[in-house]
Amino acid sequence: MDIKKLKLHHRLETNKLKTNKHYEEEVKLTQMVRAAGUAAKLGPEYLAKALEIIPQVFNKDLLVGYEHSDDAAVYRINSETALILTLDFFTPVVDDPYLFGLISATNSLSDVYAMGGKPLVAMNIVCFPACKDVGILAQILKGGFDKVQESGAILVGGHSVDDNEPKYGLSVCGIVHPGRVLSNSAAKVGDVLVLTKPLGTGIINTGIKAGIVGQQTVDEVVKIMTHLNKYAALAFDDIRVNSATDVTGFGFLGHTMEMARGSDVTIEITVAQIPFIAETEELAKSGIIPAGAYRNRDFVKNDVRMEGIADHISDILYDPQTAGGLLVSVPENDAKALVAKMLAYGSLDARIVGRVIPKADKYVIVR
């Protein structure tokens, strides 16, 4: 199925489910949880402390572990094949169960694309209150199934837990050539940074939970969160990039800092080049900021220098993203071609937002 047909299939499925819910109980999923999406994740500083007592594992075939907080593990099977192993799950960011399934699966699959691979097999991770209409859960699972189908992988079951707070996601196994693995620790001086989705999903989702976001913006953020990074990553087959990650729970600056620290470089960010979702700036100015943004700030603030950046813009840069875009480090001479290829393959956005320079006093400088 080509890209146009996949997009049409997605629209038809979404419209069909909006008119035929297949469950009786009225439910607002976002009202059943304390925090939505990646904003519900434990903060990076808290996690780092928890992992201090866990020794790093070394193996000649473990190409990527967790030493650089990378997006997934990569294990070499032979000279031609390596497996990408990842999982992700979170609480609802929308009230529609089917859309929640689509969004969560999109987010879970993203790590495989960030590592330069293709997903093969996925399994469901489900937490759901058994007292609720089973049709609601069925629609969540249907959304996940449809998005996995779009990715080209297959969904083969999973595991569930009875839980008052609904949560959904996937464990995913992907494949990549050992010589084509991408990591978040290989950015080179002279590279530029390309971002493939606008920022603001955490702030917008917080506004949605509060009922203060317009429908047009709701539709836009759902479109962004259900768009697979598969399409941007197709360009990696044509143009070799040095480093990549996806922008998710640790926010744009959190993931940028991890790339800079892992690569032992400094990354300069040009704020004027970064796209924001509609209403994001207005909500940030009004203080509609998820708690995760403050946790992200606390974790990386000593490694980031802001130069004349307004407070509300800073908040957006720390905002935890749900199913965010790819952040790619590519040689400057190849950057325009990469952007053009990404857009041609169907990426929602792709633009140059920064550059890699020799290591300075901070890992990230924002201007």
From Swiss-Prot:
Sites marked Important for catalytic activity: K41
- List cofactor names only: Mg(2+)
**Residue numbers binding Mg(2+):** D71, D111, D246
Reaction catalysis annotation? hydrogenselenide + ATP + H2O = selenophosphate + AMP + phosphate + 2 H(+)
Task: Name the UniProt key words of this record, in alphabetical order.
Answer: ATP-binding, Kinase, Magnesium, Metal-binding, Nucleotide-binding, Selenium, Selenocysteine, Transferase
According to the record, the segments passing through the membrane are none
Q: Which CDD domains match?
A: SelD
User: Where's the active site on this chain?
Assistant: U38
**What does the cofactor field's note say?**
Binds 1 Mg(2+) ion per monomer.
Which GO terms fall under molecular function for this chain's record? ATP binding; magnesium ion binding; selenide, water dikinase activity
* One of the GO BP terms on file: selenocysteine biosynthetic process
Query: Could you tell me the superkingdom of the organism this chain comes from?
Result: Bacteria
Where is it found, in Gene Ontology cellular component terms? cytoplasm
Q: What InterPro entries is this protein classified in? A: PurM-like_C_dom (IPR010918), PurM-like_C_sf (IPR036676), PurM-like_N (IPR016188), PurM-like_N_sf (IPR036921), SelD_I (IPR023061), SPS/SelD (IPR004536)
Annotated residues for binding of ATP: K41, H68, S69, D70, D88, D111, G158, H159, S160
Q: Which EC number(s) does UniProt give?
A: 2.7.9.3
Q: What does this protein do?
A: Synthesizes selenophosphate from selenide and ATP.
| Family that this chain belongs to | Belongs to the selenophosphate synthase 1 family. Class I subfamily.
**Subunit note:** Homodimer.
Q: What is this protein called?
A: Selenide, water dikinase 1
The organism of origin for this protein: Peptoclostridium acidaminophilum
What are the leading ranks of the lineage?
Answer: Bacteria, Bacillati, Bacillota, Clostridia, Peptostreptococcales
Encoding gene per record:
selD1
